[in-house]
From Swiss-Prot:
It comes from Rubrobacter xylanophilus (strain DSM 9941 / JCM 11954 / NBRC 16129 / PRD-1). This is Inositol 2-dehydrogenase. SUPFAM superfamilies: Glyceraldehyde-3-phosphate dehydrogenase-like, C-terminal domain, NAD(P)-binding Rossmann-fold domains. Coiled coil: none annotated. Its EC number is 1.1.1.18. The lineage of its organism: Bacteria, Bacillati, Actinomycetota, Rubrobacteria, Rubrobacterales.
Length: 347
């Protein structure tokens, strides 16, 4: 175990919007971390991110992972690179916080799970940051306390203001809805058993075959019900909401976080323009928690490789339903011992 005065040497792979934000948080807002390296094919952009911290710049993320200077890794590079980079971290036995999705397919994510199980200890955390958002945490605690009785219905909505052309209907599931899939699993604490997804195009600029508005209905292994609305071109701002209906009441994550101003016979409330602003605190808390666990010599306590894999299994079923127009069964999942909450794993 490390002393409290020591800091973890962290490298960040990918210095776009997400990676740049993580690097800034590590340098300015996570006292237990030292940002020692960043990697990006765009070394000029990486250099800009590294300038204030003096971090070493790499062009190749694999070289950063192999560097003796780097003790732990944050991956925020394009989705197809996630699984290969995480596997390299496992090969080098370095803790890694990987942005969602863990991989670009369930098959690729399963290989990560298999590699970590073979290693025999948990080193992977997946960036489902909503689990750290104070509002989501408050609702989770209310549900866990039994305040509304056992949950019977999950209702989630996820709306972006706008998006540039170039996305696909599948992208909406893998990149946006994946957060809501994880939220449903986290709040209800059951695996999703069946999904039925319908979509429509509300933004011709994206192409007629792109369904930017999607509605998922699902049932869980225990018979709970759920719905998820994803709208990536809402036109009015960024909004995420969750309502849990219990046997004796409901509890809700407020969709908007800004102050309500009442004046001149009207009330107004600011709506954020994107997820970085809405979940800024969650990203900081997530990173502080991850680094704190590493400093204590503990396995990351956040969403793990199994959560990343399970969410992608559901996402793949959603895509199949979207294409077929019919309900789709989700592959039955049984977590290995390493990921079971009811089993203490040592090593």
């Amino acid at each position: 175990m490390r002393g409290d005065s020591e800091r973890i040497a962290v490298g960040v792979v990918g210095t776009g919007g997400m990676g740049g934000m993580h690097a800034e948080n590590l340098h300015f807002r996570v006292p237990g971390a030292r940002l020692v390296a960043v990697a990006d094919l765009d070394t000029r952009r990486a250099g800009g991110v590294a300038e204030r911290s003096g971090a070493e710049v790499f062009e190749d993320g694999f070289d950063l992972i192999r560097s003796d200077r780097v003790e732990a890794v944050v991956i925020a590079s394009p989705d197809p690179t996630h699984a290969p980079l995480v596997l390299e971290c496992l090969k080098n036995e370095k803790p890694v916080l990987c942005e969602k999705p863990l991989a670009d397919s369930a098959d690729a994510a399963r290989k990560v799970v298999e590699a970590e199980v073979e290693l025999g200890r948990k080193l992977v955390q997946v960036g489902f940051m909503r689990r750290y958002d104070p509002q989501h945490v408050a609702v989770k605690e209310a549900v866990a306390s039994g305040a509304v009785g056992a949950p019977v219905l999950f209702r989630g909505w996820h709306r972006n203001a706008d998006i540039e052309p170039g996305i696909t209907s599948e992208w909406v599931v893998i990149n946006a809805t994946i957060h809501d899939i994880d939220s449903a699993r986290w709040f209800i604490e059951e695996e999703i058993e069946e999904v039925y997804v319908r979509g429509m195009n509300t933004a011709p600029k994206l192409g007629a075959n792109v369904w930017d508005l999607q509605l998922i209905q699902f049932t869980t292994a225990g018979g709970r019900l759920g719905s998820i609305e994803t709208n990536v071109v809402s036109g009015y701002g960024y909004e995420v909401g969750v309502e849990i209906v219990g046997e004796r009441g409901t509890v809700q994550v407020p969709p908007l976080s800004g102050a309500i101003v009442r004046r001149g016979f009207a009330a107004s409330q600011r709506i954020e323009d994107g997820w970085l602003a809405r979940f800024h605190a969650a990203y900081v808390i997530e990173m502080q928690g991850w680094v704190g666990a590493l400093l204590r010599g503990e396995a990351p306590a956040g969403p793990d490789a199994w959560d990343g894999y399970a969410s992608l299994v559901v996402a793949d079923a959603c895509i199949a339903s979207l294409r077929s127009g019919a309900p789709q069964k989700v592959e039955t999942l049984e977590p290995p011992t390493l990921y079971r909450r009811d089993v203490e794993v040592t090593g």
